[in-house]
Amino acid sequence: MYVAVKGGEKAIANAHALQENRRRGDDTLAELSVAQIEQQLNLAVDRVMTEGGIADRELAALALKQASGDNIEAIFLLRAYRTTLAKLAVSEPLNTAEMRLERRISAVYKDIPGGQLLGPTYDYTHRLLDFTLLANGETPPLRTADAMQDAAPHVFSLLANQGLAKREEDSGAMPDDITRTPPVCPCSRSSRLQQLMRGDEGYLLALAYSTQRGYGRNHPFAGEIRSGYVGLETVPEELGFAVNVGELLMTECEMVNGFVAPENDAPHFTRGYGLVFGMSERKAMAMALVERALQAPEYDETVTGPAQDEEFVLAHADNVEAAGFVSHLKLPHYVDFQAELELLKRLQQEAARDD
């Protein structure tokens, strides 16, 4: 039972003013601009865009500033804003094989068509605090060269050409849209991928880690991780042909997972897939691992771990929903607690009489 309580309007206004003052911090210091957040906290912006469901770096940076750097609050702000937007068009499927690469690595083949590209990464740093950033924050000038990129087909397409993996085929079915129709388990793969993309990174990371510790049959290799710019196209009704309307910075991960040996088919590797906005590589990898774990029923695998339980995974992945439900405990529950209190006192009195 929930009790509607009207709080003091003045107290609430004062609380908001205090929060705004705390957000701003010491006013003798220069205020952090949205442009600075967008450029210098770019990985935080990437996460807010991915889980907020809007590919707009400026809006994601604004949300982070308004939320004092609280990722989940920023994601909530972006989701709320998204509900006010009209759906203008539907884009064509993204062709990630033609991605203008910023980074591309494979853990299964050293030499791949198009080559590997290390790109920007923290992977090989020593994780030591860089105190020079306290002094001036200057970075040395970066030497660049003209971009020259060879064709870079997906590693999984190479496996498929050798008969070692199934080729992904487009069924032609219209993908689900979880923003318009609430998902219901069992979910289609399109619905599942959308929910995982919007799911909380920490939650998916923990589930992905659990699959590596024996809670679910999953033996993965990072087949390919690629980050870069993908062209975005749409087909206007009045034109009837695709028009490029921009590009998106995205990260894609395909995990090569343990093989299966169906009765009516040749043994082959399976795959898990992850796709996110920006350079959120860790999220893409976690998403791919969990996505494969959720395919257990399709391969007649025994569901033994939490990451393989579709209803459990997807029902608890949304951090906005989770934060909202946990936060509601801060609301007054006076009547509920009073009922529990009266019951406890009555039980204590009955126990005392029995003694």
Model-flagged regions — what are they?
Residues 143-355:
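Acidic, serine/proline-rich low-complexity intrinsically disordered regions
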Residues 1-227, 241, 349-355:
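Short, amphipathic alpha-helical interaction segments embedded in low-complexity terminal/linker regions
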